[in-house]
Amino acid sequence: MSSASTKPRSANGVSQPQNWVGFKEVLSEEAFRRMISLERKRSERTQRPFALLLIDAGCSQLCDKQGRVWLDILSALQGAIRETDVTGWYTTNSVVGVVFTEIVLDNNPVLSTILSRIRALLRDGLDADQFSRIKFSFLVFPDDWDSQNPERPSNPTLYPDIEKRQESNRLGRATKRLIDVLGSLSLLAILSPVFFIVAAAIKLTSRGPVLFRQKRIGEHGTPFTFLKFRSMYINNDSSEHKEYVRQLIAGQAEKKSANGNGESVFKLTNDLRITPLGRILRRLSLDELPQLINVLRGEMSLVGPRPPIRYEVEAYEVWHRLRLLEAKPGITGLWQVSGRSRVKFDDMVRLDLQYARNWSLWLDIIILLRTPAAVLFGEGAH
């Protein structure tokens, strides 16, 4: 790139064009992405939103030929944004961004005015072809996550720290996937007699299909069809469970415990929807076996966070969403072997995040080895 190329990153993470004099500092890609991550974490903690504007110049070739393009873009930003806003490279020499801190979302005229002014300045400063190539993206956290549509995949743009961590561990993720495929195929073959016996028992003891299918929310908010052996009567009412899940996530379940002893559990006890055979299947976790098919399909892993139901995600707090981004859902996980259903919801999410951020093949092996004991002797299964 000619006049718009950047100098090497300085010690404070600031990049500036070589002929840029008197302009507001522009953070380097590394520093700006770190800024986005810190601002998001602040928003998760305080519930105060922020906004991110990204401007893509269209193609690097255009910028190489027209070195003024980036200077015009940065000049427009300099003339429009507030003193408290932060400018930086989201992708060096390709996408520039602005973090708008301390915003008020309800009919906020300030942001609308800023965006309109930036567009107007660029339209006046660039020729029509250059302006037509520019793409604008505007994201608001946490409102960018539509709570009424939890099946919409999340936007990784606001989570550069997670994206970086996953990119740096591609080999580990590929190895984990290989183990999932080989493990699920082996277990499906070995346990095929158990599948047949359980399926026959379900058909003989209650009306309805052998398999229970339910829409669950997977990695990055992607929905998938979750499989279990049916343990409930058909045509049951889920309203009580929906309300209990809402109370549990809100931290109110201890006041009105499902098991009557003051402990909060994730699953309802004395649930009249469950068949007598279903209670046995759940106690031994045999109802979970069809999830090996989900693992083979790549929708789940042998080890990972529990995949949530849609109405559960609708009740999530902002920081709870991280469990959908950090790891693929699994059949068993750290929280399951740390108390199973009796772990409080916030603690369950913390254990899921702890697992994802400290993941290793050895940790997966430990969890898999501890799972049979948790199934046989744990008191939390229902």
Located regions from the model:
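N-terminal hydrophobic signal-anchor/signal peptide
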Residues: 1, 34, 46, 102-189
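PAS-family sensory modules
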Residues: 1-40, 157-170
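Conserved long alpha-helical elements within nucleotide-processing catalytic cores of c-di-GMP signaling
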Residues: 15-40, 44-54, 58-78, 108, ...
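Hydrophobic structural segments characteristic of membrane proteins
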Residues: 265-268, 282-382
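Conserved helix-loop-beta segment at the catalytic/binding core of cyclic-nucleotide signaling proteins
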Residues: 40-45, 74-105
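Short, glycine-rich, amphipathic interfacial segments at transmembrane boundaries or analogous
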Residues: 212-272, 332-348
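A hydrophobic, helix-centered structural microdomain
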Residues: 168-243, 361, 366-382
